[in-house]
């Protein structure tokens, strides 16, 4: 089992990567095994980059509509959230937050 979650594959960049890999597979330019290696490296790179390079902070408020805990993964559905950055506020109708336990014991600091 992979030590990295596949969450970022559902982001816009992850979907674009998956579509491009599917095209390459259907054209016979790469094998499905190579595509899986690329996706694994994508999962690893996204996880490491977000853990090591992103240092921005924000606060948010909203109405908790739904929450679930299944297989060590929390999912929260927040309605009417308001995000406050340093000098900007952004709102939305609904967001989903997915929080996963780290699989790397050295990351528990």
UniProtKB/Swiss-Prot annotation:
Source taxon at top rank: Eukaryota
InterPro entries recorded: TFIIA_a-hlx, TFIIA_b-brl, TFIIA_gsu, TFIIA_gsu_C, TFIIA_gsu_N
Molecular-function GO term, any one: RNA polymerase II general transcription initiation factor activity
Principal subcellular localization: nucleus
GO terms, biological process: RNA polymerase II preinitiation complex assembly
Keywords tagged on the record: Cytoplasm, Nucleus, Transcription, Transcription regulation
Gene3D superfamilies: Transcription factor IIA (TFIIA), beta-barrel domain (2.30.18.10), Transcription factor IIA gamma subunit, alpha-helical domain (1.10.287.190)
This protein's GO CC annotations: cytosol; nucleus; transcription factor TFIIA complex
Location in the cell: Nucleus; Cytoplasm
Entry's family note: Belongs to the TFIIA subunit 2 family.
Subunit note: TFIIA is a heterodimer composed of the large toa1 and the small toa2 subunits.
Its biological purpose: TFIIA is a component of the transcription machinery of RNA polymerase II and plays an important role in transcriptional activation. TFIIA in a complex with tbp mediates transcriptional activity.
Protein name according to UniProt: Transcription initiation factor IIA subunit 2
Origin organism lineage: Eukaryota, Fungi, Dikarya, Ascomycota, Taphrinomycotina
Gene responsible for this protein: toa2
């Amino acid at each position: 089992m992979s030590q990295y979650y596949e969450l970022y594959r559902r982001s816009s960049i992850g979907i674009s990567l998956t579509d491009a890999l599917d095209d390459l597979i259907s054209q016979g330019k790469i094998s499905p095994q190579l595509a899986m290696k690329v996706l694994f490296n994508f999962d690893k790179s996204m996880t490491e980059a977000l853990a090591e390079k992103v240092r921005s902070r924000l606060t948010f408020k909203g109405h908790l509509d739904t929450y679930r805990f299944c297989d060590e993964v929390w999912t929260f559905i927040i309605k009417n959230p308001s995000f406050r950055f340093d000098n900007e506020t952004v709102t939305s109708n609904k967001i989903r937050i997915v929080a996963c336990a780290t699989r790397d014991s050295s990351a528990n600091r």
